């Protein structure tokens, strides 16, 4: 059994010097894509993991498959696309917060139902996905169909809100529709403090009313990243709300690329370690706090 993700896999071209991309001369390539990063981190934490996606039948696609195999991430369900190229993103470093230029109409945007063998669900102990893969058809419909089928079979679901308004362009209403769909399917949700505030504003609720999100979408575990303030975890057990806030170790940030993905992986790894993937709402406060400390280690 493995934790699987269905979502984007791409090449991160990360600038080797600070400054705008039109001035940068050197980049280094790494495997990327938020859900893919989560699976790599899980594998490094000793949790069996796998990826369901699509890459181009090109050198970059082959590079990704090779690197993921080296990380012991199962790629048996990654298909090759002979029409669309492997996804790429350019990452520019300006201060501690990176900025991204992501290209659309790439292989992972064209995952179709025929690309996925539903037999993989027999080997899934948790299914993870995020909102970026929902930007474009046919991947949107394919992913939602697959997640809904996993949910129907009782497989726990985790969702990374990961709001990227630039990818949705003029379709912001469509973005919110799909973010809400992801929230409604998920048992575990990860979002940033900024994303939490945006969702509450969209719902017409005050910023301090965020526990209502657990009831609004029937979420079992809500994990909120708070940057330099650490993280907050909220768990609903029947009528009882359990919450822990974890302060961070104080460090000087150099590059925050992938930090949220490492956070997401640590949450899943904590649930796996406590054998609570299928009984998330039975976490006690000590276990919840331990999972919180995993995030900032």
Task: For each feature predicted by the language model, list its residue ranges.
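Glycine-rich phosphate/adenosyl-contacting loop at the front of the ribokinase-like
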Residues: 1-74
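Conserved phosphate-binding/catalytic region of the ribokinase-like
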Residues: 3, 148, 203-297
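Active-site metal-binding loops of divalent metal-dependent hydrolases
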Residues: 9, 132, 161, 262
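Short, conserved phosphate/pyrophosphate- and ester-handling motifs at nucleotide-, phospho-/glycolipid
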Residues: 42, 192, 260
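Conserved N-terminal subdomain of the carbohydrate kinase-like
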Residues: 48-131
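Well-ordered beta-strand positions
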Residues: 77, 126, 187-188, 221
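Conserved beta-alpha-beta core of the PfkB/ribokinase-like small-molecule kinase fold
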Residues: 135-212, 219, 229-230, 236
